[in-house]
């Protein structure tokens, strides 16, 4: 008998063979497909086809909106009221589930200034709109006994009370959080605020250094930048100026150089400048002013003697040259004596009808206003012959406070001084010759070309040369 049972089992005639579990699952999935879970709309993004309901704050916050007309008892839901009416033997009706889909309802916040007051930002359930109104616009009635934090929704207060004091997140600023997400949000904001504060403090510090002129500030060293373009000026003692605008004429760009006003034809028009009060000096070096004459008088005199003896650009042609830097000596290599200059001036051919210019020995020097070779513009700003002895940026050396004897010694060291002496004394020598003075009356020929002293000395004749 045992053998028969074994044969029956092996043949499968007496028992059904079990099916695999994978086959069963596949069959069940075909018979009952899984229900697709409908996703919930995000807060503030209602269904466009939903019914929008607007409730007043009183109705929204009422705890028992549904009241019994017999006993006056209130209920939160209409279903509860219907069940209560059944106890009073009143007609009652419960909502029946139907196959027809019920239209959705959305609720707007009664607060007009709230973003959820608009229908496009309505909330999808009545409980949600209640909690929103309590949290944002309601009174906070519940307070935590441990941390004294207040809440407007009772459920929020209960949830906080369960975790308060058990977990603690402390920020560097001293704020304590019990929730990690709140701590992370605050920490990001706090770090960004600290970074911005550090930037503002750094900028304020740099501005303070710049205003105070401290080393390392953003201010540039003007003397260092311009040192390669403007030669250093020797200190000098300035004299009072009558021109109120002379402070604005300290730095002038160098103009094109020329041999002289008589010989050069490419000279640029000179810039308007104030009157010069010294034979040797510069009225524009206000940046090197020294107010104390007694302290620096000896040093200034030594600098004047050294500069006059070593300057190579002050040759005779530079007596009538325009303003130029000290190193621009390309056109100053032609040396002419005072007699040659007078002969050249006489050959230009100016005439005069008056002899008043010969009465004053300084008239000759005062009759040389700077003029441009360009006949369309004339700069007659009172610059007399005294301004022509040197360049603007180099010879700010002499002043009226110097001793007369030291100035005379300095003049005798260079050709310019001898030329100036010859020019200043020429009218007097001529008058002595004509008047029969100490030289002798008419025995020798002094006027080489026969043009007369009047022609050379009158201001109009000088203007004719130029």
Swiss-Prot record:
List the InterPro entries hit by this protein, alphabetically: C2CH-3rd_BIRD-IDD, C2CH-4th_BIRD-IDD, C2H2-2nd_BIRD-IDD, IDD1-16, Znf_C2H2_sf, Znf_C2H2_type
Q: Which GO terms describe its biological process?
A: asymmetric cell division; leaf senescence; photoperiodism, flowering; positive regulation of DNA-templated transcription; protein localization to nucleus; regulation of DNA-templated transcription; regulation of meristem growth; regulation of timing of transition from vegetative to reproductive phase
Biased-composition ranges for Polar residues? 1-23
Which GO cellular component terms, listed alphabetically, does the Swiss-Prot or TrEMBL entry include? nucleus
- Per UniProt, the C2H2-type Zn-finger stretches lie at 66-88, 107-137, 142-165
- First and last residues of each zinc finger (CCHC-type): 169-192
Q: Describe how it is modified after translation.
A: Inhibition of transcription factor activity by KIN10-mediated phosphorylation at Thr-98, Ser-178 and Ser-182 under sugar deprivation conditions, thus delaying flowering.
Residues binding Zn(2+) 1:
144, 147, 160, 164
According to the UniProt record, list the residues that bear Phosphoserine.
56, 178, 182
Q: Which domain of life is it from?
A: Eukaryota
Which residues are Zn(2+) 2-binding?
171, 173, 186, 190
Give compartment(s): Nucleus
**Residue positions of motif Nuclear localization signal:** 134-141
What residue spans carry the region label Disordered?
1-29
The record's note on what follows loss of this gene reads:
Delayed flowering. Roots of the triple mutant jkd mgp nuc contain patches of undivided ground tissue (GT), indicating that cortex and endodermis layers are not fully separated. The quadruple mutant line jkd mgp nuc scr has short root meristems, lacks endodermis and miss Casparian strip.
Question: So which tissues is this one expressed in?
Answer: Highly expressed in vegetative organs and at lower levels in flowers and siliques. Expressed predominantly in roots. In roots, present in cortex, endodermis, and pericycle layer.
**Induction annotation:** Up-regulated by 'SHORT-ROOT' (SHR). Strongly down-regulated by sugar deprivation, but not regulated by day-length.
Alphabetical list of PROSITE patterns matching this protein = ZINC_FINGER_C2H2_1, ZINC_FINGER_C2H2_2
Keywords on this record? Activator, DNA-binding, Metal-binding, Nucleus, Phosphoprotein, Repeat, Transcription, Transcription regulation, Zinc, Zinc-finger
List of residues that carry Phosphothreonine: 98
From the Swiss-Prot or TrEMBL record, what is one GO molecular function term? DNA-binding transcription factor activity
SHR-binding, as annotated region: 179-191
Q: Which PANTHER family match?
A: SERINE/THREONINE-PROTEIN KINASE RIO, ZINC FINGER PROTEIN NUTCRACKER
Q: How does it assemble?
A: Interacts with AKIN10.
> What is the stated purpose of this protein?
Transcription activator that binds to the DNA sequence 5'-CTTTTGTCC-3'. Regulates photoperiodic flowering by modulating sugar transport and metabolism. Regulates SUS1 and SUS4. Transcription factor that regulates tissue boundaries and asymmetric cell division. Contributes to the sequestration of 'SHORT-ROOT' to the nucleus.
> What is the designated name of this protein?
Zinc finger protein NUTCRACKER
Q: Which organism is it from?
A: Arabidopsis thaliana
Instruction: Name the gene.
Output: NUC
């Amino acid at each position: 008998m045992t053998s028969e049972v074994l044969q029956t089992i092996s043949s499968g005639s007496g028992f059904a063979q079990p099916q695999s579990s994978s086959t069963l699952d596949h069959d069940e999935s075909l018979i009952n497909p899984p229900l697709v879970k409908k996703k919930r709309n995000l807060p503030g993004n209602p269904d466009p086809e939903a019914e929008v309901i607007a409730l007043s704050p009183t109705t929204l916050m009422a705890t028992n909106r549904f009241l019994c007309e017999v006993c006056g008892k209130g209920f939160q839901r209409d279903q509860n009221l219907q069940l209560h009416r059944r106890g009073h033997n009143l007609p009652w009706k419960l909502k029946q589930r139907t196959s027809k889909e019920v239209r959705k309802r959305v609720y707007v916040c009664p607060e007009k200034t709230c973003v959820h007051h608009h229908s496009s930002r309505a909330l999808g359930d009545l409980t949600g709109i209640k909690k929103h109104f309590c949290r944002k616009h309601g009174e906070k009635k519940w307070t935590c006994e441990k941390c004294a934090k207040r809440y407007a929704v009772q459920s929020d207060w209960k949830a906080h009370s369960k975790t308060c004091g058990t977990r603690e997140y402390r920020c560097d600023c001293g704020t304590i959080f019990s929730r990690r997400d709140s701590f992370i949000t605050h920490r990001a904001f706090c770090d960004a605020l600290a970074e911005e504060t550090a930037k503002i403090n750094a900028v304020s510090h740099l501005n303070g250094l710049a205003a105070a002129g401290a080393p390392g500030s953003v201010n540039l060293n003007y003397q260092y930048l311009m040192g390669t373009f403007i030669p250093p000026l020797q200190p000098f003692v300035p004299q009072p100026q009558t021109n109120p605008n002379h402070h604005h004429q300290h730095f002038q760009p160098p103009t094109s150089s020329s041999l002289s006003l008589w010989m050069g034809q490419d000279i640029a028009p000179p810039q308007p400048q104030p009157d010069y009060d010294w034979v040797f000096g510069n009225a524009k070096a206000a940046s090197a002013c020294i107010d104390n004459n007694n302290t620096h008088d000896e040093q200034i005199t030594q600098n004047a003697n050294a500069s006059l003896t070593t300057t190579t650009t002050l040759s005779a042609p530079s007596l009538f040259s325009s303003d130029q830097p000290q190193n621009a000596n390309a056109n100053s290599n032609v040396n002419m004596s005072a007699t040659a200059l007078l002969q050249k001036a006489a050959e230009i051919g100016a005439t005069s009808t008056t002899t008043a210019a010969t009465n004053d020995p300084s008239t000759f020097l005062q009759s040389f206003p700077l003029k441009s070779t360009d006949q369309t513009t004339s700069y007659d700003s009172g610059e007399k012959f005294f301004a022509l002895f040197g360049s603007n940026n180099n010879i700010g050396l002499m002043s009226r406070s110097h001793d007369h004897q030291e100035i005379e010694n300095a003049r005798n060291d260079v050709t310019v001084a001898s030329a100036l002496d010859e020019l200043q004394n020429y009218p007097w020598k001529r008058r002595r010759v004509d008047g029969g003075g100490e030289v002798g009356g008419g025995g020798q020929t002094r006027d080489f070309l026969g043009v007369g002293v009047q022609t050379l000395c009158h201001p109009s004749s000088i203007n004719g040369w130029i």
